[in-house]
Amino acid sequence: MRADVVTIFPAYLEPLRLSLVGRAQERGTLEVRTHDLRAWTSDVHRTVDDAPYGGGPGMVMRPEPWDAALSEIAASDPARRPRVVVPTPAGRPFSQRHAEELAQEPWLVFCCGRYEGIDARVIETWADDEISIGDYVLAGGEVATLVILEAVARLLPGVLGNSASAADDSFSDGLLEAPAYTRPQVWRGVEVPAVLRSGDHAAVARWRRAQALRRTVARRPDLVAQAELSDADRAVLDAVAAEVQQAATPGGQRRPPWHRDSRA
């Protein structure tokens, strides 16, 4: 995969040289090219922004540098057309499914906006995707690009040492991931669940699935409605619902039995 990133702060993308994304580049699985948008300006001040029409605070990124940059990048490989991604709080929410979709693309171009955003005409002309990584506002699109690229890169063939790691991740099956444990067996008086030490792979799988369901119900109940559930899953959910009904606190509020009491 090739990924081009256009930004006015190229140094912001240095973390792409590290960890999984860095190793993917070393292996040739991923090629990342970072571009300074100011290279496509034509004035002595290398201006990339201007006041917004209609008034209001802040500045808007001008269309000319963006159009010149994207035109030149796209022309660098005439045989292919890149998928252009604009990180923005106004975009559709990013998810694991979206990462899987982008991981199938041979070429991505990320446009990192700043100030009050990029002139809407650039978005209308060039953007294939407008993506939001959450309901909050950042100073620019660079952090969102780092998030999206890492989520995508780890899905590329050979990037993870164990391909099962991606398959077992949170959201890969629509649920949050089950809790994980390692040595020592007992830490601060808390022992690793016996089933994980049993050597019974089927029992371990059942335990992890049940814990994933419990965790998802407690933290992201919206995901349960979208997940593909088996009869065994529904039995776990029925049991969880029954436990919650029996776990009323003195104030009348109901607390899930897996909720850790902060006073303990």
Curated annotation (Swiss-Prot):
It is an enzyme of class 2 (transferase). One of its GO terms (molecular function) is tRNA (guanine(37)-N1)-methyltransferase activity. It comes from the Bacteria. SUPFAM superfamilies: alpha/beta knot. Keywords: Cytoplasm, Methyltransferase, S-adenosyl-L-methionine, Transferase, tRNA processing. It catalyses: guanosine(37) in tRNA + S-adenosyl-L-methionine = N(1)-methylguanosine(37) in tRNA + S-adenosyl-L-homocysteine + H(+). Its EC number is 2.1.1.228. Homodimer. Belongs to the RNA methyltransferase TrmD family. PANTHER family: TRNA (GUANINE-N(1)-)-METHYLTRANSFERASE (PTHR46417:SF1). This is tRNA (guanine-N(1)-)-methyltransferase. It comes from Frankia alni (strain DSM 45986 / CECT 9034 / ACN14a). The lineage of its organism: Bacteria, Bacillati, Actinomycetota, Actinomycetes, Frankiales.
